[in-house]
Amino acid sequence: MEYKALIVGLGNPGSEYAKTRHNIGFMAVDALAEVAKSRKSMRFKEMGISGDFELFSLNLAGNNVLATKPLTYMNLSGKAVAAICGKYSIAVSDVYVIHDELDLPCGRMKFKKGGGNNGHRGLESIQEKMGSPNFFRIRVGIGRPEFSSQVKDYVLEEFNTQELAIAAQMSQAAIKGLNLHFRRGQGTATQFMNSFMPDLPETEP
């Protein structure tokens, strides 16, 4: 079977990271997996490479696509992406990466192709292994802590209850945006994702 694209959700493996800000990409791919035609785990060693990833086959807007969660740590994510793209002949321009973005507030997202990595180790790894920055990025905002020295701990902290509800909405918005992209093109998808605003859950008094 030929696949039109690879959707990559970035995160860290392990239950202790499941609800952390750095794992919004995993959350989005888990949401995608709920509509997947099939789900299977594949090991890099089957391709002669050490490491693991989860791989999903699904249909978006009539297109066969793959989605993956690299089960290495964030800074090695590119190994999974390069291995899958090599096996299934997917070009870097057909890779879509969903990741956390410090420079956007929680509840906002941006869709773009190429550009800088803003210090994101997962994006840097993908660019290094694929040899190009020209992949799509769905940047999901998590906000930024007050001081730069707090970033490392901040991204590994769990979302609070309100943020977790917003993250679920952002995951669904990313899925809708990808469907729009494959159905109507990049412009329509960009307009939707860049203007998306979540319904803020009510907080207890």
Curated annotation (Swiss-Prot):
Active site annotation, chain numbering: H22
GO annotation, biological process: protein quality control for misfolded or incompletely synthesized proteins; rescue of stalled ribosome
Alphabetic keyword roster: Cytoplasm, Hydrolase, RNA-binding, tRNA-binding
Coarse class of the protein's main subcellular location: cytoplasm
GO terms assigned for molecular function: peptidyl-tRNA hydrolase activity; tRNA binding
EC number: 3.1.1.29
SUPFAM superfamilies recorded: Peptidyl-tRNA hydrolase-like
Record-marked site positions (Discriminates between blocked and unblocked aminoacyl-tRNA): N12
Record-annotated site: Stabilizes the basic form of H active site to accept a proton: D100
UniProt keyword Cytoplasm, yes or no: yes
PANTHER family: PEPTIDYL-TRNA HYDROLASE
Record text on subunit structure and interactions: Monomer.
Functional description taken from the UniProt entry: Hydrolyzes ribosome-free peptidyl-tRNAs (with 1 or more amino acids incorporated), which drop off the ribosome during protein synthesis, or as a result of ribosome stalling. Catalyzes the release of premature peptidyl moieties from peptidyl-tRNA molecules trapped in stalled 50S ribosomal subunits, and thus maintains levels of free tRNAs and 50S ribosomes.
Listed name of the protein: Peptidyl-tRNA hydrolase
Organism per entry: Maridesulfovibrio salexigens (strain ATCC 14822 / DSM 2638 / NCIMB 8403 / VKM B-1763)
